Amino acid sequence: MMSWWSSGANTALDEQIEKATSSSLEDIALNLEISDVIRSKTVQPKEAMRSLKKRINHKNPNTQLSALNLTDTCVKNGGAHFLAEIASREFMENLVGLLKAVGPAAPNPDVRNKILDLIQSWAMAAEGRYELSYIGEVYKTLQREGYSFPPKPTVASSMIDSSAPPEWVDSDVCMRCRTAFTFTNRKHHCRNCGNCFDQQCSSKSLPLPHLGIMQAVRVDDGCYAKLTDKGGKSGGSDRKHHSSSRHHHHHHKHKSSSSMQPRDARVDDSFDEDLKRALAMSLEEVKSYSRGHSEPANSTQYKPDKQSTSVSKIAEEEDEDLKAAIAASLADMEEQKKRHAAALKEQTSNVGSSSSAAPFTLPKNDYELTPVEAENINLFATLVDRLQTQPPGTILREPQIQELYDSIGALRPKLARTYGETMSKHDTLLDLHAKLSTVVRYYDRMLEERLSKAYGQHSIGGYNLPAPRQPTGPYPTLDPSAPSAPGAAENFYTGEQQADYSHAPYGQYPPQPPQSQYMPYDRRSSMVGPPNPQYPQQQMPQRTGSWGNAPPAQAPQYNYSGNEVAPSQPGHAQQAQPGAPESAPGAPNNDPNASYYYNPGQPQQQQQQSAQQAPAAAPDHSYPTLPQQGHSYQPSVPQTPASVPVQPSQTPQQAHQRVPPPQQAPQQPYWQHSAAQQTPLPPVWQAPQQTTTYPGYDQEAFPSAPQHAPAPKQPVVEEALIEL
């Protein structure tokens, strides 16, 4: 028995089986390669069967179907040794177990039907063979159990017959030269016949494709001569003698004897038998259509010499007929082309006509190929390709090929006319395509013109201009929903709680443009004239009782960045000085609101008071006290010109009193301010509580106060109230 199996071959076979049984489409070429590997006995048939069984038990139904199809291909082409493993109890019981599985392990309906179909077809093909009888027993058992099989197909036993390498025969002497085998004269087996030979009689090597062996293997000299000699038929009796001593069945003996012949090695394969059957069926169909020649009664009576003479005669007659047929077909082709093109153009021109018109009927396709004729042409081309690898003279022994050649020769005029019709259709469709492309291009251009006109009309009225941007400034607008909220000047005098900048980092203040871009605030112009146009959203301060409900949105109205450099005090007084004389003549002296800012009846008292308290009260006159929780620095309103000359003497002390302490007492209410300003105050007052400055803030880090701000609250106001 052969011993050239290896684990590497089994591993390669497993990989090929996994690739062939994937969930993708079936690969017929790979299936045939696997069957050739099994037939050539490169791997053990039991290992191949177990690999297929493992893939059949897969959970994926697509993989199971592919594995079943591969198993069927291997059964038909794998040889008798593989059929014995398929008919074993191990494989068949596995299929029956899949059929009887219930619950989650129940097979897919398609897989179940495929298993039943394969068991039925294998049982019918193996009928009459003792070594494959277990398949028939399983089939009958399933029938008795009530399984519904598909309709019985007609399967011949030759469907599972395939040529496989023969079993090796053991002998003590060379079966050709009768030399005994010794330690130096080794024993070798011929892969073609399986007999034992020594080195001298088996030194040749040949591939054996009829046995599924594609690589060159060892053969004896007799088999080498028979396989390579194209016309030699000698040695047939010896071949029969050896095969009869080796096989027990007449069928296997016949196969072994015929496999020695160069032509019979391929013709007697099951595939060639199927091909012969297909040829016969196609010829019968040709006869039914009465377009072919009649098949001879006995095709085996054709001799090579008669066949060659008939081929030459037919070729000569066909040349003259072919010339006449080609000339007639060309004339008909031109006429048919013109007629068909005119009919198509007429149909396209009458598209817009009424539906009651007679429908267009295509010309009769008298010269169109029938499916049977097209199949015969393809079959003839396939046979011609296969004859390239056959020994010479094979074409003479195949009368079916000659019959196909005769029937296809009569189809040449049809092919020519069909080609003409196709070309005319192609030209007409090209013309229609060109017209359609032109119409589409004109339509696109018209749409573009309409769109451009529509957009041009809209642009005339200026609708496509961008919307004007609202002027943005460094100060946010006041909330219009709170008209009674106090303004910036009122916050200054009412003493409302403001943000304390001592709790915020230095670099978090938003940068603002320089103060020189804005007009200085004039208290009299804000009271008499219209508001400054630089602040259109700011309302005039209203002295109402709702001063304590100022919204926090007003807090960042006058934010001053720490990066700004405050202008000097004299320069600020000079900026505010020109606006004061202009508004002084028109200032109403009898206005109670204006009396809050300056009292005409007490100018001398204020001047005298400021002259007496200039050394100590300079920080309070020039800057209001800032509470701890304020949100922004509020710019103070300008002061009357009467207090302007006092400012130069106050400048040196302002550098030390720039930032008031956060521990300062809260400011007094609004009405206390007005009472304190309208009544004379005693010159005695308390000194400032604390003059410490915060580290990291210098004089330039805070904005300078206007020079003529009204006098804020005095620390001794309570004494004045007590006197009142």
UniProtKB/Swiss-Prot annotation:
Tagged with keyword Cell wall biogenesis/degradation: no
Record's compositionally biased regions (Polar residues): 296-312, 625-640, 670-679
Renumbered residue ranges of the record's region Disordered: 228-268, 286-312, 462-714
Topology with respect to the bilayer: Peripheral membrane protein
Record domain VHS: where: 18-150
Disulfide bonds: none
UniProt cross-references to Pfam families, sorted A to Z: FYVE, UIM, VHS, Vps27_GAT-like
UniProt-recorded Gene Ontology molecular function terms: phosphatidylinositol-3-phosphate binding; ubiquitin binding; zinc ion binding
Protein role: Component of the ESCRT-0 complex which is the sorting receptor for ubiquitinated cargo proteins at the multivesicular body (MVB) and recruits ESCRT-I to the MVB outer membrane.
Family statement drawn from the similarity comment of this UniProt entry: Belongs to the VPS27 family.
PANTHER family, A to Z: VACUOLAR PROTEIN SORTING-ASSOCIATED PROTEIN 27
UniProt domain comment: The FYVE domain is involved in the binding to phosphatidylinositol 3-phosphate (PtdIns(3)P) which is required for the association to endosomal membranes.
Record's protein name: Vacuolar protein sorting-associated protein 27
Organism of this sequence: Neurospora crassa (strain ATCC 24698 / 74-OR23-1A / CBS 708.71 / DSM 1257 / FGSC 987)
